[in-house]
Regions:
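Histidine-centered active-site/metal-ligand motif
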Residues: 2, 167, 187
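N-terminal hydrophobic targeting/anchoring segments and the immediately downstream early-domain regions
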Residues: 1-125, 130-142, 146-147, 193
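Acidic, glycine-rich loop-and-beta core segments that form the ion-binding/anion-interacting portion
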Residues: 181-182, 187-193
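Active-site glycine- and acidic-residue-rich loops that bind
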Residues: 102-106, 161-168, 190-194
Length: 194
């Protein structure tokens, strides 16, 4: 469900194309061959990017989502509503824009709203590290959801967006499960099978 194609397109500044770039683990040709019906495209910001640059890096990746992934592949269709999946034609593939870690927005819910307006419909609060929303799986402190994280989940609930529990520490996972109406685990493992 999850792929890092947008990060690679951003890193190469558009020198590779989503349609058939062999450098991408996920490209249009591979999606067709695998008969994939919906693909999630993650916007990811490396932790070492300066705080004041993170939102712009997110916007740049979204630019490649619209100009290359959707713009150069007419059979890719933007998924903004649940019904968009149901109305996909046989030869179409849905493209779901996601955010992996909310570091790009700092503590500004208005920036989060802008990302929603640009098409983001699934949000992972962290990427292994701690941020202003929650602690990630590699944060030794293991604290849960912050009040800002609760605000993000409330926004997700109101707008029928997925809250992705991938990369969260255990306490943050359970905090999200207690308040999220639309939780998912897009790329996670279970601790046990019962």
């Amino acid at each position: 469900m999850h792929c890092d194609a947008l990060l690679k397109l951003y890193e190469t500044q558009g020198k590779i194309q989503f349609k058939e770039a062999i450098e991408l683990e996920t490209n249009m040709e591979r999606l067709k061959k695998g008969k994939v019906k919906v693909q999630a495209f993650a916007v990811f910001i490396y932790p070492e990017i300066k705080a004041e640059q993170k939102f712009q890096v997110a916007l740049d990746q979204i630019h490649y989502f619209y100009t290359d992934v959707l713009g150069n592949n007419p059979n890719m269709k933007l998924i903004k509503e649940w019904t968009d999946i149901e109305t996909l034609q046989e030869d179409e593939i849905g493209a779901l824009l996601t955010l992996e870690g909310v570091d790009a927005i700092g503590n500004d819910i208005k920036k989060f709203s802008i990302l929603y307006q640009l098409g983001v419909r699934s949000v992972g609060l962290t990427w292994n590290n701690a941020n202003l929303a929650a602690d990630g799986a590699q944060e030794k402190r293991g604290a849960g959801l912050t009040s800002f994280g609760e605000e993000i989940v409330a926004f997700n609930n109101e707008h029928k967006m997925f809250t992705d529990v991938s990369h969260l520490c255990e306490k943050a996972f359970w905090d999200v499960m207690n308040v999220a109406k639309y939780p998912i685990a897009s790329h996670s493992n279970s601790r046990a099978i019962m």
